[in-house]
Amino acid sequence: MKSVLISIHPKWCELIASGKKTIEVRKTYPKLPTPFKCYIYCTQDKRLSFWRGKAYAYAYDIRDNGKVIGEFVCDLIGLHPGIDVPSSCVPIEELKKYANGKMLARWHISDVKIYVRPRELRDFGKTRPPQDWCYVDAE
């Protein structure tokens, strides 16, 4: 069964793990029936780290950035103009700029699981992270 590996910046990973961010906004979306599983790849950031044990909060140790830190179920996808989407935690002006007058896909985030130990990309048959998202085979 196909799943998705999605690249997300550390600041958004923290908000997803805390339950504050329940919508992921993207320009595209997978052609999969919902619900489907999404694996969260926490992108590398030289200044911030999301992954710090059970606290799941920023720290100055960035060794675990660049790994798959958890998963969620996308149970609904909706198209939306680039206007206010409060559950995305993205400011309206940033959404408008990102949308550039086009529709955006709202991926609804549910059933978030953060791993006790982050996983490597090679566990998903990948040697480098996706620019945005990519299909992967489910385990």
Question: PLM features: what roles do these ranges have?
Answer:
Residues M1-E139:
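Structured alpha/beta reader/binder surfaces that contact nucleic acids or chromatin modification marks
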